C-alpha cells in the first residue's frame, strides 16, 4: 500500500503520541516504584530480625570484613574471588571495589576517622592501607612474625590492634600498629585470638578466642600497652569470630557454627541472641543513616545479611564527630 502525504503525516502524529504516552506511563511506573521504596525505608523495621542484604554466592566462602564508610557503603573481602574487596550499597547492590596485590588476602577491615581503609592481610603478614578515592593499596605494616593477622580494631588515637591466631597450635597473640606503621607485640600466650574491639572510652580492649570460647578484656595504658587481663565470659559451645561495640559499650559477637550474633554487656551478661540466616557468621559492623543497622558477613550462603538494633554502633558514631 502506498500512503499519501497527508496519511503519512497523520500516522506519524499517531505514532508519536502513542510513543510519548507509553514513555509517560513507564516514567509513572518508575516513579511509583521509587515512592514505594521510599515509603518502605520510612516504615519502622522490626528490631533484631535478620534479612538478606545481598544475593547468595556473590562473595566467596571467605567473605569477611565488613566495614562502612561515611557515605554508608559496606565493604567486605573476597567479592566473586579471593584477594578482592567488594562494595555494597545499603540497598544490596554489590560490585568489585579493588583487587589486592598478588600474595595478599584480606580479612578484617577498619576505617579511620579520616576515611582511610585498613585491611588485615593474613597471607602477606601485612596490614594494608587503601585510599578510597584512588583505590591505591599500600602496606602500612609488615611483620614476618605474625601468624596471620585476622581482625582489626582502631583506638581513639588512630593506632590499630590486630588479632593473630595460630590455628594449627590453637594459640594466638595481639599486635599494636601505630599510625606510622610501627609494630609492637602487646599480648602473647593466648588462645586463638579473633574478634577484637576497643571500648567507647578507649580504655579497654576486648578480644575473643574462637576455639577456647573465651572473651577477655585488657586495660589499655596511656602508651597503648595492654595490662590487667581479665576473663569476662566463657561460652560452653560453638566458636567466635568478629566482634563490635555499640555506643553503650555492649558487644555484638558472631557465633561461628551456631548461626547467631550475641549481644552482651561489658560485664558478660547476655542480653539477646539473634539468628542470622546461616550457620557461619564471620563478622559484623554497624551502619545505615542512624547507625542502627547491623551488617553481618555470612559464609554459608556467601552473602551479607542485616538487622536493625536499638542503639547505634560505635564506629558509626565516630563518623559523626
Q: Which residues are covered by each model-predicted region?
A:
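Bacterial N-terminal signal peptides that target proteins for export
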Residues: 2-14
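Bacterial N-terminal signal peptides
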Residues: 11-24
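A short helix->beta-strand "capping" segment at the edge of beta-propeller domains
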Residues: 37-59, 229
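Beta-rich, blade/repeat-based domains predominating
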Residues: 57-74, 100-121, 126, 143-171, ...
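Beta-propeller domains
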Residues: 76-96
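A short loop-to-beta-strand structural motif that recurs across blades of beta-propeller domains
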Residues: 84-86, 126-128, 173-175, 214-216, ...
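Short loop/turn segments that connect beta-strands within beta-propeller blades
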Residues: 88-92, 131-135, 177-181, 220-224, ...
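Beta-propeller fold detector
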Residues: 95-99, 138-142, 185-188, 227-233, ...
Amino acid at each position: 500500500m502506498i500512503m499519501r502525504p497527508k496519511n503519512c503525516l497523520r500516522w506519524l502524529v499517531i505514532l508519536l503520541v502513542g510513543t510519548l504516552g507509553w514513555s509517560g506511563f513507564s516514567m509513572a511506573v518508575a516513579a511509583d516504584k521509587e515512592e514505594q521504596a521510599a515509603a518502605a525505608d520510612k516504615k519502622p523495621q522490626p528490631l533484631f530480625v535478620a534479612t538478606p542484604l545481598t544475593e547468595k554466592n556473590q562473595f566467596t566462602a571467605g567473605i569477611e570484613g565488613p566495614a562502612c564508610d561515611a557515605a554508608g557503603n559496606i565493604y567486605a573481602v573476597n567479592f566473586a574471588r579471593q584477594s578482592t574487596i567488594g562494595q555494597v550499597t545499603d540497598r544490596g547492590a554489590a560490585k568489585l571495589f579493588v583487587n589486592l596485590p598478588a600474595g595478599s588476602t584480606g580479612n578484617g577491615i577498619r576505617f579511620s576517622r579520616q576515611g582511610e581503609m585498613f585491611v588485615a592481610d593474613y597471607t602477606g603478614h601485612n596490614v594494608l592501607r587503601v585510599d578510597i578515592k584512588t583505590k591505591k593499596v599500600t602496606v602500612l605494616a609488615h611483620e614476618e612474625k605474625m601468624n596471620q593477622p585476622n581482625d582489626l580494631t582502631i583506638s581513639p588515637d588512630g593506632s590499630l590492634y590486630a588479632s593473630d591466631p595460630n590455628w594449627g597450635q590453637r594459640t594466638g597473640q595481639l599486635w599494636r600498629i601505630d599510625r606510622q606503621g610501627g609494630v609492637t607485640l602487646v599480648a602473647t600466650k593466648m588462645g586463638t585470638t579473633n574478634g577484637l574491639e576497643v571500648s567507647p572510652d578507649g580504655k579497654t580492649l576486648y578480644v575473643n578466642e574462637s576455639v577456647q570460647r573465651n572473651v577477655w578484656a585488657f586495660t589499655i595504658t596511656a602508651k597503648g600497652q595492654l595490662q590487667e587481663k581479665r576473663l569476662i565470659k566463657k561460652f560452653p559451645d560453638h566458636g567466635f569470630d568478629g566482634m563490635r561495640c555499640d555506643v553503650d559499650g555492649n558487644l555484638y559477637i558472631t557465633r561461628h557454627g551456631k548461626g547467631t550474633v550475641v549481644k552482651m554487656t561489658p560485664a558478660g551478661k547476655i542480653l539477646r541472641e539473634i539468628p542470622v540466616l546461616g550457620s557461619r557468621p564471620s563478622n559484623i559492623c554497624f551502619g545505615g543513616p542512624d547507625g542502627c543497622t547491623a551488617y553481618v558477613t555470612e559464609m554459608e550462603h556467601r552473602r551479607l545479611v542485616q538487622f536493625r538494633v536499638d542503639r547505634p554502633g560505635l564506629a558509626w558514631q565516630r563518623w559523626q564527630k
